[in-house]
């Protein structure tokens, strides 16, 4: 079952293509995936049943983040890059290579054009990877026909079959000029970088001619060839047309908050994304300029060869300081990348606002719902009390404080209650009177602020005792309500008003959830304090039974050793070091 945090983020997912990064409890990326529709895909992990590896993956996810792209193909390419960079544990299939083809122009005297699954630092040109394997293979065949290089083993003394077919420049029987290869490689690179308009126009005309001449099989082949080319060389913003290392900064501002995205492009790939959110004091352009300078002032952040920024940034000033060209993209692929980064900036900030809104409903909004149900003005502070004891022995009380719907643990208080013969047994009335008087008489004495509402864990007895002390002994008019549980010991309702009427809250409301959290928290705090006290009392009673151990010696032992086990393990010499006589020290050792 998804956590509340994940449920909130699932509700905010965009129905756009992109990549998602799943994180574990240590904020480590354990899985990277892509999706045509992030909303549907990511939700499926938490809204469907799974088995095997997927079930194990989902059980370890505590958070996720997304990066939106313009197309599904861009998401695919980014996914491969992120997997190769982060090596997530659950991406087993893609850990060794991508599993998808690249088109490669080899770095040889007589270069070849071929398909490969691995990218190596061998001086060759690589294009891809391509999600449509068959389309990539067909495009390779097309290129080998239109822009031939070497297609045989070479140097075999006679022309090969491909030379006769016009698909090899003839390295098989002659020395091919390097300029011939260079010219062909330029054409291939332009083609694979998306400059295919002339080729597509030519194929379209040939297809139309074939159809007019009723050569339908030929027309279908040309149609398929067009589709393969479009699938292979579709414009890709994730892959840039040069290998210049560059960083790209984009921002989005709303409601006084600035969202910044940083894209790191290396080896023609978007290899990393960073995001930052903070309040904006100056103009967003000034804030971004300052942020960029601070970013590269950190010792681990290396300057790239080029920095891309949105319009309105003082580029010359930044460039003079950083000694790096700083540019604003005006058209083409870089501008498209900037727009994609700006879109991510906007979505991140919108997610923050909506999560804050949801959190506000759960805290401040929930507290307001409780106050509304009781007919009280909205306040900030709720204090809740609960008692704990075993058949009246070692009675304690605990108080928890919630401010604007959030637990403030530094304001929690614990009370050891008076235990007398007159108060033997579970005397909830006396326990309530004592703790309420002690708490609020002290606040009055110290001149501190009073809460807006007091909640008593219990029924009519606790409620009336608290009201009586406040009104008749302390002269205070703090509203008091009783938290009532059902037969299953679950939060059920509130008791409030002169007639102690029952106030029901909608069990599905945030106010009811907050009331449950308060009741559970004060109960937990009281129980833990009582157990702690019982443990100390048990330890003290064992020491009291030892001859020669009085209150002072007992206090020394407890203060220095902390537990019965440590006292038992201590040597006679260690006990004597506390000022205990050797005889008493030996008696302690024998008794324990």
Curated annotation (Swiss-Prot):
Q: Which GO terms describe its molecular function?
A: DNA binding; excinuclease ABC activity
The answer to keyword DNA repair applying to this record is yes
Question: Where can this protein be found?
Answer: Cytoplasm
> What's any GO biological process attached to this entry?
SOS response
Q: Which Pfam families match?
A: GIY-YIG, HHH_5, UVR, UvrC_RNaseH, UvrC_RNaseH_dom
> Which keywords label this protein?
Cytoplasm, DNA damage, DNA excision, DNA repair, Excision nuclease, SOS response
Q: Where is the UVR domain?
A: 197-232
The GIY-YIG domain extends over: 15-92
Q: Which GO terms describe its cellular component?
A: cytoplasm; excinuclease repair complex
Can you tell me which family this protein belongs to? Belongs to the UvrC family.
Give the matching PANTHER family: UVRABC SYSTEM PROTEIN C, UVRC/OXIDOREDUCTASE
The UniProt subunit note reads as follows: Interacts with UvrB in an incision complex.
| Cited function | The UvrABC repair system catalyzes the recognition and processing of DNA lesions. UvrC both incises the 5' and 3' sides of the lesion. The N-terminal half is responsible for the 3' incision and the C-terminal half is responsible for the 5' incision.
Name the chain's protein: UvrABC system protein C
Q: Which organism is it from?
A: Latilactobacillus sakei subsp. sakei (strain 23K)
